[in-house]
Amino acid sequence: MYTKWNHKIVLFVTIIAVSTLAVSAQMKVWSVNSESRLTIITDKAVERQSFPIDFKLFDLNIDPLREQLFSVVDQNARQRPTVIQLPNANGDIEYFEVYEDSNFEPDLQAQFPEIRAFSGRGLTDKYATLKLSISPQGIQTMVFRTDTDNEFMEPYSQDHNTYAVYKTHRDKGALPWACSTEDRGLLFDTKSKARSLAPESSTGEVRTVRLAQSCNGEYANFFLAHSAADVALVLAAFNATITRVNGVNEKDLAIHFNLIAGTTAVIYYDPLTDPYTTLSSWNAQEQAVMNSNIGAANYDIGHMFGASGGGGNAGCIGCVCNDANKGSGITSPADAIPMGDNFDIDYVVHEMGHQLGANHSFSWSNEGSGVNMEVGSGITIMGYAGITSQDVAPHSIDTFHAGNISQIQANLASKACPVTTVMTANHPPVLVAVPGATIPISTPFALTGSATDPEGDPLTYQWEQVDQTTTSGNASVASPTKATGPNWLSFLPTASPTRTFPILPTILSGLFVTPTLPGGDAIANIEALSSVSRTLNFRLTVRDNHPYVAGSTTGQTQFSNTIVTVTSAAGPFKVTSPNTGVTWNGNSVHNVTWDVNGTTANGVNVANVKISYSSDGGQTFPTVIKASTPNDGSEAILVPSVNSATARIKVEAIGNIFFDISDANFTTTNAPVRSRADFDGDGKTDVSVYRPSNSTFFLIMTTNGFGGMAFGNPGDVSVAGDFDNDGKTDIAVYKPGASASFSVFKSSNSTIANTSLGTTGDIPVVGDYDGDGLSDVAVYRASNNSWNVIKSGGGTSNTVFGSPGDLPVVGDFDGDGKTDLAVYRNGTWLILQSSSPVNPLVTNWGLAGDLVAPADYDGDGKDDLCVYRPSNGVWYIVNSGGGYAFYQYGLSGDVPIPGDYDGDGKDDIGVYRNGIWYIYESTSGVAIFNFGLNTDVPIARQYQP
């Protein structure tokens, strides 16, 4: 596999290189059309009611495109692809790797070599898959997208030189169309199979189904075909429609329709003499035409296209390969325009889906088929989106419902007629089974799958409810009190394996019910969290989106079922605070609260929860505040230091699937920028000294000027820090002795706080050990190498770290906002990082006799290792962001005083020499201040005994 994969990569790169050169050497294929749309004579298909309002226009130079495409047909079809460019609905050009995907049996293809079909995979967008048809009349395309709308392209101008590219927004409601296929007389027991929904995957085979396609005279005339001499015009139209039909079938079902050569015998050109009379008679008339003109042994499925009448009828369900009625399916639009995306997908794929074995999937009418599993009108191919009184949307999506896929798979498994080709180049995805869960009522939840693909194809995931309805009409829509049947609409596959229930906008609005999609009926709610006990059955469909290649390979699917049990004995589980537009300052402590409501028992049994933070209004939750905390309804958290007016909190069950998100945005702010010895809170280190002889602090503050304050007693040790989280350094001292203590003068309220901690010989090591933005009082006890901390947020810690003779060092070396435990041992640093407190980080940096001066010199939020060597006045720095720095700045006897004196977020080097400050600011160079006595202690200097 490794060698094969690398061969693919080499081949792929070669193809890209060769094709790119070929494209650049040719005339430009696509150009933006700059004409006024009012001046363009449009193709008659543009007149259809479902033609989109929003689209992009491009002019096509078709000859070089045709040359590229035809380089990989016939004998080259399986050997190599080509690379082409196509415009998208955003107005950009994309690259596709393209293979031939003929819809004609070889004899028919040989007769009409100018009519071709191709499949492709996106190179610009790896999730994109392409279906393209080409003929002398031009091209049509369909691009399947992921996490955005599918796209179509078709001729816009009458001369077919200008093309419209648009996103799928089909509106069937304006057209009086209905499928009249009835559920009676099934040729295969689709009901019992649908109810079981046993986990199945694609079989690793391509099924090629022989299609006999007929049409009446009105259809042929629409495409300007009036006699057998014009047969190519009709075949080109068939080809365009079947290309799109195959796009859906190949992706979901691994089925490919091939038009048989005998199709030309059932194409009719004169409406007055063709065998088709009234719409209600077409099914039987078509079957007779197929039997007499083609013969039952020569085709597997037969279908007929009309141009008007507004209806479709498969004539049967699951009758493919059954001689009695396999040739009785019909499709005819109401607007006399039998082409375009709505005709191809909403009508033709729907009716052929019946013939393959699929029933209707809607629940507005309960047909009792076992697959009435969609809310209201339904939205997948076998639904009725846009044509009921319970429309969940005005148009369908381009996938089969999981229940219908299961029906068709089971039906074809019992049939011998499709030609099956075992694939060696593609295999079904490998899917991990998803366990079930019991959840509380009225509480959001999420289902997550996990799958891999043997060939590395880009996988997509689709979660769907698979409960048969027991209601109909207005009772078929989603409702919190609905105890059975569908409550969750199907959505298009996504690249994410997770689906949240309900959709995120509903959750963020604090609602339990998702209203109808734009254009749907007001009554047709599409999602509802259950407020009653019930069972929900879900199926995950994973698609590998592999393109069809010349009958040898196509897309594969894999499935997993799971059961979610909703119990009214618990819930709702709900975040209660923050739930309004409050403001929480970064690095402050606040309580997150939630209603537990019986979720620790009652079969839900969630003992712990995870708390996460979002700064983008709940779209993502990248910040985990508490990885695990008891499910007790309240937790004090440290607010992330992030500026956001759209913050949200998420509390989610551990070991279960339910969660809740706070209902309203709230505001968080950045924690104040903390520079050492910043007494006025302006983000700059202030020139300041402590005079031990009289316990007086002298300050030159950059914004408030000179200040002084006597605090403490002679012999006390300065231990300045921000003890009240106001962004300003507080005056504080450590009183050594047998009953040592700390005394703090808080700048926020001018109060004094005294804390007893320490004994003779202890070294004060003030720092923010719990990361709450407040300095904690702490001592290092050299007698037993223990760090003793009283945390501002509550609690104490006692950690043994170090050896006799070590020098304790204070710093945040991993940038997590918490002070790490660190010691310096004769040139060796040992750091126990708070983010990884298992094995200490050991680094040799320095010599015995060096003075440690850790600080954030590169401004990355992490303190850097640094020593100042008195013997030569050199600073030796290891930047945490990478690299080293060396500075000759100082003399023997100088005291290193690093700090951010210019407020640029980077600590500057500096020395204190007999009352004179020599600072080398990173923004403006040398600054010298005469302030203090030679016996004073610069407060910027970390205390060292």
List the model feature ranges, each with a label.
Residues M27-I40, T162-V320:
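Fold-level signature of zinc-dependent metallopeptidase catalytic domains
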Residues A671-P945:
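Trp/Gly-enriched beta-strand/coil motifs that build multi-repeat beta-propeller-like domains
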Residues L412-V430, V564-P572:
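Proline/serine/threonine-rich low-complexity linkers at boundaries of modular beta-sandwich domains
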